[in-house]
Amino acid sequence: MRVVILLVSLIAVPYIMWQVMRIKGNKNITALENVQTGKSVSIFEGNDYALMDVEEYLVYCLPGIVDMGMDDEMLKTMAIIMRTSIYGEMYPELVYQSPYAEEGGETGLEVATGTDSAMYNLIRNGSCLVNEDSLTEVRYDKSELMDKWGGSYYTYMNRLCSAVLATKGQVICYEGMFIVPVYHQVSVGQTVSAQEIYGKEIPYLQGTDSKEDITCDGFSVTQVVDGLRIKKLCDLYCEQNPAAYVDYSKDASGTNEDSSSADDETKADNGRETTAGDKATEKGSADNVDKNTNKENEINILEATEHGFVKYVNVFGKTMTGQTFAGVMGLQSANFHIDQVDDGYRIITIGKGNSLGLSLWGGEAMARQGRTCDEIIKKYYANVDIVDMAQ
């Protein structure tokens, strides 16, 4: 009998403690449940539709983009970024300019020209209802977060709620319009412009120093892959995606002159010639650009941007974009260097992501140095304002 009682206790006590944590978690978000901004999201929950204020909605979306080891100021930064994204999706005509928009697409500049515009005031003072299906954010429900965080649920929810409440209504604007607040994990030592990555000038997406990123574990990753394996992976992918191999010849004249100038930089100070590894770490792949597309027995980079993001790569006589090649090979960014070694091809990858917009690693470093979320945002997004829509 004692053994039975002991077994029941071992099972029941943790269960009771777990239920207590669940109750505490629910109490923790009461303050946010009472926040009413007039901007609501229609969600499907419990076999029925319900309305959730955008501020509460943020709390359940943030776990998908933040690490709970982040500093509180970085959590605030990400709350402002995600709120800006949601507002931009609610009011797409008031997004200043998106790096993903088609050339010549609507920028919203004719709809509103600043913070005194009628449309801007409508957003601040009016109501809005959107269906969750029209938003790109991913929302976690309470049970999913409880399963994910376990006993840390209450602590983590409290931190997220605090970050959202501390920044309530704050969004990032350029000339009175919402920006598209793109971000990445780790830059190549500095962020780059939208012009470099997407070929279009976007004033709030300019390059800035982010030297803290080079201290990140995995900033530079080196792997050696057999050439036949690379060919097989690329061919298999292109069988499933026929457009993956592209015609580079139509862009070969004129567009590559800037990239080829990087070859002149292979000499370092004091006359020392840098090695492939040195140069890849310093400036991505720009040092080994070779515009010869007829090398059917080799893999070589055809064109790269100023900071080493590969635009086109030759794979045994066929051409792929650098982004496609990085995806096929599972590289952490399209900033890579390739050279042939005895065992195959050495691929050195720099950074994580496209180095556009906010660097999560760099922003976290700033937060731990005592910088505020406003300072972090204004470092990585040029000439922006943080506007309080709740006032």
Residue map of PLM features:
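Conserved, single-site charged/polar hotspot
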Residues: 1-391
